[in-house]
């Protein structure tokens, strides 16, 4: 299994240490073991390679943008099973990651993973986003929902000059969503991701 992870990371030119491979391997195995109990991911994707490619690698496609902007802290909203927050934290260990998840089941899983993977740069926040009072330079979200559903509330959690990085799919759908929220932000940028996964993946950067 570790060889599969190494191949996938190398194919996308990600830099990694052997300990990163070990953590990803353990993380995926824990998801497979506990998915039914914690309702972490879709059952149709509940095999090792699907989790590796559709979730782990996809999450890592945003890492270069985080490093380019270089915030001191990152808030990951609706972390679920930990994508992208846990993955980014593994490969970006010098930065603090806050993972906000309202579901008690999923936040319990995240707390278990944080301890087992020894992720000292991760803090789990278990409550509704409306209760968050802190302001952040950088917010990530990886959700299938329309950006119009969460753009305003996330904007209100941004520091001046901060940005939201949303993982999104097809470009034509993104254009429709961007038109609904373009007046909320000073700048909106769409970055096409160089994915080998044969799926259309983009990042939408929403600047306050």
UniProtKB/Swiss-Prot annotation:
It is found in: Cytoplasm. It is an enzyme of class 2 (transferase). The keyword Signal does not apply. Pfam families: GidB (PF02527). S-adenosyl-L-methionine binds at residues 78, 83, 101-103, 129-130, 142. GO terms for molecular function: rRNA (guanine-N7-)-methyltransferase activity. Belongs to the methyltransferase superfamily. RNA methyltransferase RsmG family. HAMAP family: 16SrRNA_methyltr_G (MF_00074). This is Ribosomal RNA small subunit methyltransferase G. It comes from Borreliella burgdorferi (strain ATCC 35210 / DSM 4680 / CIP 102532 / B31) (Borrelia burgdorferi).
């Amino acid at each position: 299994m570790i060889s599969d992870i190494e191949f996938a990371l190398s194919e996308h030119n990600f830099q990694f240490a052997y300990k990163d491979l070990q953590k990803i391997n353990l993380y995926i195995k824990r998801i497979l073991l506990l998915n039914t109990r914690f309702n972490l991911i879709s059952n149709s994707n509940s095999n090792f390679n699907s989790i590796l490619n559709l979730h782990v690698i996809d999450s890592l496609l945003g890492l270069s943008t985080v490093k380019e902007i270089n915030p001191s802290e990152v808030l990951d909203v609706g972390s679920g099973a930990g994508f992208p927050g846990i993955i980014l934290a593994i490969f970006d260990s010098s930065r603090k990651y806050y993972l906000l998840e309202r579901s008690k089941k999923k936040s319990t899983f995240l707390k278990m993973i944080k301890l087992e993977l020894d992720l000292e740069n991760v803090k789990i926040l278990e409550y509704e986003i409306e209760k968050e009072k802190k302001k952040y330079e950088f917010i990530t979200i990886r959700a299938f929902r329309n950006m119009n559903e969460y753009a305003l509330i996330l904007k209100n959690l941004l520091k001046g000059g901060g940005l939201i990085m949303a993982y999104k799919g097809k470009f034509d759908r993104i254009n429709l969503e961007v038109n609904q929220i373009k007046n909320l932000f000073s700048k909106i940028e769409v970055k096409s991701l160089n994915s080998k996964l044969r799926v259309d993946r983009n990042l939408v950067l929403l600047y306050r």
